[in-house]
């Protein structure tokens, strides 16, 4: 099997040229069209970009077929891409642009009116369409394509300083991940994959590349649909899905609809979950509703290419453990549980930090050598990553035991609580704050902000909360904004003078 992602995707243009690689809301893109358009765009980039190929290309948009064309065209020109979704606030986009130092900023949709990109060329949607037309029929030099350990994509995740970090994923990383998904999860040719996550979220890689590499069809549910439950419940059975890829929270939302079942979705027999804890209650209800389906629980950080462990969730597994296991490590990886202080590898049954070693592990953070050295290291010639996750191995399965720091998963998004706190402290009405995750059914249900406010003239607390949220939305993504607000005159402190987070946590999670 060829190791080139692009060659394997392009091969479907010969095998099944008219089969849709993307289909949604009347928009259809065939494998032949994907190849021709990405060839044209790759040719355009090779002829017009003279900058260092180490500099990535930012692709701005939202789950459209044009984003796929831009991704693959960038790869064919030898440059990694950075997906940036339209839902991101302007300040976040500016932070990513500054950190990535891109060679080009591609707009597959219009930029917000209050965002101006400087310091690199910008390609508008009209210019992109014009480039595809002018270079139609051209084929870029295969030698120019991203290969081996070259960066393939870079996804920005939450950083503890308030600035996002760019995780570099190479072609080799992506090949390892994609081969594992297709083989271990028994995904055959021509299946229809749900695309729930925006491309700026690495969960999307779990549907995008397994779909394209197996000659399948990517079926996105964009933000206009997922924001309206009636539309969502109507659309899901209409899409004739075979493979479900989402966060558990999204499945919980769909399970609120009594019609979300096997009868109305007869082909839906593969469920793949990642991004947060899969509760036993969710898995059990899915098995009730979809008796023909196979459910997989997976685990992995962005730094190890989406996911590295898997377990098939059966009634026996649900009944055997108090919480669902994360599964077993993929064949070309090793997993150690280590003592966080000494680095000593711990035996089965002891809790410690999860360390991942092998083919899926990223080379590090783009343009951030110090942050890279803090968590990435060489282990006997293999790349290794300290996850900051606490875990334990029982019966050969990995079990998640929470975060060792202030990082959590909420609705599939990885969030540094310090990131939120640093951003909240920018708000004029906040003197000090602490963010506490409220737990429900073994996972984070919502974020609670405990706040010491500055002097203000609001009569009611809800008025203060509204004013704070109004400021926050200018520079923080919606999923990071706390849902509940508690106001205090002072915080409890530990003996060494730090905020007593255990005390605050016990208040929130009584």
Swiss-Prot record:
The lineage of its organism: Bacteria, Bacillati, Bacillota, Bacilli, Bacillales. One of its GO terms (cellular component) is cytoplasm. Pathway: Cell wall biogenesis; lipoteichoic acid biosynthesis. ATP binds at residues 157-158, 297-302, 389, 498. Belongs to the ATP-dependent AMP-binding enzyme family. DltA subfamily. GO terms for biological process: lipoteichoic acid biosynthetic process. Pfam families: AMP-binding, AMP-binding_C. Catalyzes the first step in the D-alanylation of lipoteichoic acid (LTA), the activation of D-alanine and its transfer onto the D-alanyl carrier protein (Dcp) DltC. In an ATP-dependent two-step reaction, forms a high energy D-alanyl-AMP intermediate, followed by transfer of the D-alanyl residue as a thiol ester to the phosphopantheinyl prosthetic group of the Dcp. D-alanylation of LTA plays an important role in modulating the properties of the cell wall in Gram-positive bacteria, influencing the net charge of the cell wall. Transmembrane segments: none annotated. PANTHER family: ENZYME, PUTATIVE (JCVI)-RELATED, PTHR45398. One of its GO terms (molecular function) is D-alanine [D-alanyl carrier protein] ligase activity. Keywords: ATP-binding, Cytoplasm, Ligase, Nucleotide-binding. It is an enzyme of class 6 (ligase). It comes from Listeria monocytogenes serotype 4b (strain CLIP80459). The gene is dltA. InterPro entries: AA_adenyl_dom, AMP-bd_C, AMP-bd_C_sf, AMP-binding_CS, AMP-dep_synth/lig_dom, ANL_N_sf, DltA, DltA-like. It is found in: Cytoplasm. It catalyses: holo-[D-alanyl-carrier protein] + D-alanine + ATP = D-alanyl-[D-alanyl-carrier protein] + AMP + diphosphate. This is D-alanine--D-alanyl carrier protein ligase. Its EC number is 6.2.1.54. D-alanine binds at residues 202, 306, 498.
